[in-house]
Amino acid sequence: LDVSVQAQVVNLLGELTEELGLTLLFIAHDLSMVRYISDRMAVMYLGGLVEIGTSSEVFFDPKHPYTQTLIASNPEADPNHERNRQSTTIQGEIPSPVNVPAGCRFANRCPQAMAHCSITTPVLKPVPTTSEDLQSQRLVACHLYD
């Protein structure tokens, strides 16, 4: 969809969720749009959840290295900031989604990987939240938070 039609669809979805009290599962690669339309966000890598939290928390304080890279790769609206921004790329080969490697799915591409990341699969676990919502739960699947 072109940008104007995309914005109209997203605005309509937002209005419908408010007016009708709907819950949506919105799957997208555009994290800015996800942040705009959703209250909570989940980030996946190779079919596995790596981070869950409020959209603001995940977008402004990403915990998982993959989420950090995704957020950093979003283009800046200000052309001066975009021009001066350092390039963000993920090194390494993408593992096969059919033959998922042992341990953390992101380990071979993670700049912060430790030896046990390639052996032990991290599970989603709570990390401190910055949300004022007492019902908010922030979860991250990363050995950095063991």
Which residues make up each language-model segment?
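P-loop NTP-binding/switch modules centered on Walker-like glycine-rich loops
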Residues: L1-R83
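Charged, flexible cofactor/metal-binding loops and thiol motifs
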Residues: T54-D146
